[in-house]
Swiss-Prot record:
Residues 151-153, 306-307 are annotated as: Interaction with tRNA. This is tRNA-specific 2-thiouridylase MnmA. One of its GO terms (cellular component) is cytoplasm. HAMAP family: tRNA_thiouridyl_MnmA (MF_00144). It comes from Desulfosudis oleivorans (strain DSM 6200 / JCM 39069 / Hxd3). One of its GO terms (molecular function) is tRNA binding. The keyword NADP does not apply. Keywords: ATP-binding, Cytoplasm, Disulfide bond, Nucleotide-binding, RNA-binding, Transferase, tRNA processing, tRNA-binding. The keyword Metal-binding does not apply. It catalyses: S-sulfanyl-L-cysteinyl-[protein] + uridine(34) in tRNA + AH2 + ATP = 2-thiouridine(34) in tRNA + L-cysteinyl-[protein] + A + AMP + diphosphate + H(+).
Length: 358
């Protein structure tokens, strides 16, 4: 009879399952690994190299997990991380979009390349320190918000496939950040990375625009700034330095502040408007990943159009298999192409995709 993992309510394939926990050096993955070990699961740890981490982190991790009697494998995925995350990030900016690399990293790296590597080691599942949870029913695997409203991270996992979700384990699913810290203190677990992970982990100590310039030397330079009527009002320093909704760096005096309304990449033109000009009633979403299935017709949902935003009520209509239209109950400010839009029915994640320009 298959073994039930006490941290998730459905059987694993093996009678003696091996769970690989992805460890970064932070407190969340450290506690996740310890909880799995406490549960009686056979646990191994994987630390993946991106090419953008401190050089001494891998060795320090090995020492840390040796104390917990958990073997650590170092997985070099620098090439695939560069092509799937960093290159995606820079290319999106050069298209005038505002990407969310964490969402892509989770689907292509953590639960993509790393999951493949874990399976090559004989692991049945991959665990992380994300604050979210999954359940399984006859229709498939469902993704839910985590217990801590301030830390829950289901938004970042909305691109995971059914196979990926089925092999994912989230030991912190019903814990708050305070409970995680208390567990670490109670068991003497000291992370090697004290800072909270950032949205763009591969940009350290520099501006986003400077990073993009280093990645893509031949980048378009200054160009015109136009207001909403098409009137020329200034010159920008490079479109890769701006995102929709941004106020800083426009430097065009007016009776009220200007905000970035759109980026016209074909003309190398920055379109700006006043705050009231940036509210939109509807947006189109592409490359939608439905969890577990595409809804039929239209339905009322709550939607999050960026991670650090509260969900807002909207009407969701699926168009074909991977497109959708979101009609906001109240027009929303600065809906940025390239960002992830994630749909919720209460605490359940219905799916998510990429916001596209109208």
């Amino acid at each position: 009879m298959p073994l039930m993992n006490p941290l998730n309510p459905w059987p694993l394939e093996s009678s003696n399952p091996l769970i690989a926990v992805l460890v970064s050096g932070g407190i969340d993955s450290l506690v996740a690994a310890h909880l799995l070990k406490q549960s009686g699961a056979d646990v191994t740890a994987i630390h993946f190299l991106t090419g953008y981490e401190p050089e001494d982190r891998a060795g320090r991790l090995e020492k840390l997990f040796t104390q917990m009697d958990i073997p650590v494998f170092i997985f070099d995925c620098r090439t695939v991380f560069q092509s799937n995350v960093v290159d995606y990030f820079t290319a999106a900016y050069l298209r005038g979009e505002t990407p969310n690399p964490c969402m892509v990293c989770n689907s292509r790296i953590k639960f993509g390349a790393c999951m493949d590597y874990a399976r090559s080691l004989g692991a049945d599942a991959v665990a992380t320190g994300h604050y979210c949870r999954t359940t399984k029913d006859p229709d498939g695997v469902r993704l839910w918000k985590g217990a801590d409203p301030a830390k829950e991270q289901s938004y970042f996992l909305a691109f995971l496939s059914q196979d990926q979700l089925g092999r994912a384990r989230f030991p912190l699913e019903r814990m708050t950040k305070d409970q995680v810290r208390a567990h670490a203190a109670r068991h003497g677990l000291v992370p090697i990375e004290s800072k909270e992970s950032q949205d763009v982990c591969f940009i350290r100590g520099e501006e986003c625009a400077d990073f993009i310039e280093a990645q893509v030397p031949a980048i378009p330079g200054p160009g015109p700034i136009e207001d909403m009527t098409g009137r020329l009002i200034g010159t920008h320093s490079g479109l890769h330095r701006f995102t929709v909704g941004q106020r800083r760096g426009i430097n065009c005096p007016a009776e009220q502040p200007y905000y970035v309304a759109a980026l016209d990449m074909a003309r190398n033109c920055l379109k700006v408007g006043f705050r009231q000009d940036l509210f939109v009633p509807v947006c189109r979403v592409a490359q939608v990943n439905w969890i577990p299935d595409r809804p039929k017709g239209s339905m009322n949902v709550s939607v999050k159009i960026r991670y650090n935003q509260t969900e807002v009520p909207a009407r969701l209509t699926a168009l074909g298999e991977t497109d959708a239209v979101v009609e906001f109950v109240t027009p929303q400010f600065a809906v940025a192409p390239g960002q992830g839009a994630v749909f919720y029915d209460g605490d359940a994640v219905l799916g998510g995709g990429i916001i596209r320009a109208e």
